[in-house]
Amino acid sequence: MKKLIYKISLFAGLATVLISCADDFLDKPVYGVLAADDYFKTEEELQEGVFACYDVLQWAYTTDWNSMYVVKSFPADETHAGGGSDGDQPSYQQLDDFSYTAENKPIEHSFKTMYFGIMRANAVINIAVGDTPAKVQMIAEAKALRAFFYFELVSMWGGVPLRLALPGASEFALEKSTPEQIYAQIHKDLDEAIPNLPKKSEYSPEMRFRMSKGTAQAIKGKAYLYQKKYPESAAAFEDVITSTEYDLAPDYSKLFLKESEYGLESLFEVGYNITGYDWGNFQWGGNRSMENNINWQLMGPRGDYYTTGTSGLLPGWGFNYPTAKMAQAFDAEGDVIRKNACILSVADLRTKYGGDWIVDKNLDWTEAPPVWGMEGYFRLKYGSLKSETVASPGVAELNYGTNIRLIRYADVLLMAAEANLLAGNVSTAQGYFTKVRDRVDLPVKTVTLDAIKTERRLELAFEGFRFLDLIRWGDAAAVLKNQGFKKNGNFAEKHNLYPIPSAEILNNSKMTPNPGWGN
């Protein structure tokens, strides 16, 4: 994807053209553009359209300060927002302490980008004709991607407008569909896509960013799990597991490095590029052509106070510091391997790597004035690591190329364990649960729902799943108390769903706020 994604720029203006042509509100011919029905005739054109759907994932997850990764991660208890102070990036601080509103820009960005992806997928699905095997496959990819985009929406916002075609001028105002209707469409799209998708092994290495049969089956299993349809969820995950296409990578510490991208454990990733950006050519402001993962620079140890030593962890801009609670969770389980792969303490930075953090010399994180959000730990997992960027051409700060892992096999095994346990298949659940723990040398433990909850917290730390897990388990109100660095934020009933962005309500006269978020 990292090489091929540049071709997507050929498609960049097409979506607007498609809608304009579909509206048919001009009675004069428009010269220099293609009518909607004249596109996607060739396999090359269709590939450009499908790749444009994948491109939305880059834009959604790492567009400078507006990132779906941030929206999913910061409300959980894994990290603090951090930054220079409580006034640095207010939208981040609001996510951290539950003071966010329908005006929050990262939330708005996340909602908007999912509909950009849906719009692009709809163009492919509604216009392309599957008259060759390659076209049939690409239409299936678009359906699976549309299902993924809608799953992100329904799991975060609940009922949302269900748009399945390119809207005419009178159709932009659309009321919410129910969550049940959204899930029904997700399963319909996946059921139609799965028979026509290749296995992961049938893709060439450079094409493994694309939807595979196993990816779609995993999305299906996850959707059923969120619906609490446990036998159906277990069956979908079983299709992934018995395919023999995937396994656990042997070394957890290397899982989130560039060297492991699209590897043995990977089902679905957002691909990024090392592109030689410098301070003169980096494009801030949500430019959709950006190819790098700027998030990791935003979230590296704040360079004002930090020296690397031999740790390999480069300085950044100080957001997303791990909480002490997260470190304590690893310790409580005796989970040395994953702790060492995920976080680095200030004490170890000094004693093992010869680096330094020039404040809090006594390791007392309450010393005044404290570094905002800092409780003694840095992230190594998805960290600002020297191995993940280049300093020439360009500058190291702007060229992180680490992919975001959206679905990986350990997550599938833990979701399968949960679905099987709650469906009454205890021995199957035990096997999948134990397999994940074996990889990191943890002793055999009886599988229970509480044990799975703990295992997901540790295995999937900093991957953006914790907050939605707590919500679907009904644990968020009990766990997410005294949140934020000031310990003054609390999860409330309304936080079970993110707010519908104010801009969406303004632009769609039939849109209504989510419960508790205003009139």
Indicate residue ranges for each PLM-predicted region.
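Conserved, well-structured interaction surfaces
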Residues: 43, 47-61, 65, 85-157, ...
